[in-house]
């Protein structure tokens, strides 16, 4: 009875405390190499770990430059996001405008008024870097290429691409159309982390369109020469030079190498291979097991349930120097209790991954279900039930 009376009193007070703030996954203890350590044949470059975003190498990574057809990574990102939102569909027929028809550079020779499925358009962009297809998709998603370029800039801002400005959807040289190696890595990582289907398109070596009449050959020659390559996008223009954003995976370690402003295709692929080789030679993706005594629930104060079940995201993998992954330790950090309301999916703690006492990365612990705060209506119902039980 005392416990019920206290609960009823709390109902009247309706005290609601703030939940713990979330913890972001991160990697620590890694010092990136630079061109002072070793150089690659290009104007700017960066190598990052895809999972954590940790920079492993950089050279003039914040220098603003044209990026040629690597621009299409953002075009593809917006297209895949529209697909995910159900705004467009792979079997939609995308019309070709006069504007798209007049795109120069690499193309699949689309004709004004021609229609092609979005799926085929995406193949043309990913495999053959078709400018006409990129602009047609941009117009289909955004209404016009100009409007789509604004969408690209908004998305770039959201991703923290602070040194990027897009003017077109395909990457042809145009005044003010600029980015950096670091920003390219950011958008490449966003694409690869959240739209993994792009790997399926980018890993196709050869395909055909129009019933076999149009042949597509992948512009990323690393597909045939580098073990573990998964993408992503090449680019070449007079002002940008020869460029690539290359992604690769070996033994669970996923890397992204961005190379801008090489003098030739050979040097571009050489630079990307050198960066990826460096990453795979010096780092590994290591895991730590979750402690066996990790709590499965937490007490909840002022809630309609006494406890909240917990959802432990996998301790996953941490980026580690090569050969040092075997000493990782997972430590659970949780508060003594939570205060309602608790929302399913909210971060309530974290799994901290330690290496010799130093935190390397962390992963969230979330509430597995909602726990509402005590409400006046709930209290009245509880009071009524109490009175009925007494009778």
Regions found by a protein language model. Give the residues of each.
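Sec-dependent N-terminal signal peptides of Gram-positive bacterial secreted proteins and lipoproteins
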Residues: 4-26
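Active-site-adjacent loops and short helices of periplasmic peptidoglycan-processing enzymes
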Residues: 23-195
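Residues in and immediately flanking transmembrane alpha helices
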Residues: 16, 85, 287-290
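Generic detector of short alpha-helix boundary/capping microenvironments
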Residues: 6, 10, 33, 40-41, ...
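A general, composition-driven signal for non-globular sequence regions
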Residues: 8, 12-15, 66, 109, ...
